[in-house]
């Protein structure tokens, strides 16, 4: 009937299970499925694991990209989100969790609530687009689906960092932004798998690609499977955009390390399934 789940995950779960055949029909023939959701409510929390489970059983590389609620959304919503995230982690090849509270560090004190939720949506979009563009858009250095699968299949938790820069040292600046993105609750130190997307205009230099890739490689495991591709997009002008997806790291140890680092400051086909 087009109604929501009333912030009840069981309602969202039951609704998805009752429409299993329709979901299977929608996913038929997909090599890769992205399940995106805002965790904490009914539909995203309850339905997303059902969709992901179906996709994985059908043989698709299944990637979850979800947001965790803002603190102001309440303790109950946060508890539901954490439970939903753990359930989703069990049925996805790779799960990327974006903490909405971190978005406030990107917008400053003047960030409106409309802008905050729009930013959360944009981060989800950018995460998916950063991966799919590697596969679907030709570049100087191309990446195919097998490359992406080698990094993301049964990888568990993943980190996503995004950076952009113009002018002098733009590649290094963008890479540094992506590596130290406020969206990261953990560091990518010791990552055993990394997808690196570098987008720029036709003036994108090989030395810039090398500099960015080398910086990322230094932070990862010495035997990292680093898959990187370049995308030529002249609409970017002199801007370079870098997206990093890192997998295969010790999340608990890296979160402790990230907290310690912040303490001194006090502070081929892809199908996208979206749950509100």
Model-assigned labels for residue ranges:
Residues 1-276:
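Tubulin/FtsZ superfamily GTPase core signature
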């Amino acid at each position: 009937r087009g109604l929501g789940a009333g912030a009840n995950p069981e309602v969202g779960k039951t609704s998805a299970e009752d429409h299993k055949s329709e979901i299977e029909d929608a996913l038929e023939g997909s090599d890769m499925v992205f399940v995106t959701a805002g965790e904490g409510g009914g539909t995203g929390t309850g339905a997303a694991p059902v969709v992901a489970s179906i996709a994985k059983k059908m043989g698709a590389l299944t990637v979850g990209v979800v947001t965790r609620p803002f603190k102001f959304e309440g303790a109950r919503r946060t508890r539901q989100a954490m439970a939903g995230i753990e359930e989703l982690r069990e049925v996805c090849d790779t799960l990327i969790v974006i903490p909405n509270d971190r978005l406030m560090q990107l917008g400053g004190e003047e960030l409106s609530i409309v802008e905050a939720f729009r930013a959360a949506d944009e981060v989800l979009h950018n995460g998916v687009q950063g991966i799919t563009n590697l596969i679907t858009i030709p570049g100087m250095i191309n990446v195919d689906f097998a490359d992406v699968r080698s990094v993301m299949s049964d990888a568990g938790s993943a980190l996503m960092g995004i950076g952009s820069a113009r002018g002098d040292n733009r590649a290094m600046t963008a890479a540094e932004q992506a590596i130290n993105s406020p969206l990261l609750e953990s560091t990518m130190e010791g990552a055993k798998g990394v997808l690196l997307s570098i987008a720029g205009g036709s003036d994108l230099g090989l030395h810039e690609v090398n500099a960015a890739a080398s910086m990322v490689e230094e932070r990862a495991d010495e035997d990292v499977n680093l898959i990187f591709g370049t995308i030529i997009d002249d609409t970017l002008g002199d801007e370079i955009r870098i997206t990093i997806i890192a997998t295969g790291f010790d999340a608990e140890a890296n979160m402790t390390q990230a907290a310690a680092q912040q303490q001194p400051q006090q502070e081929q086909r892809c199908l996208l399934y979206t749950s509100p």
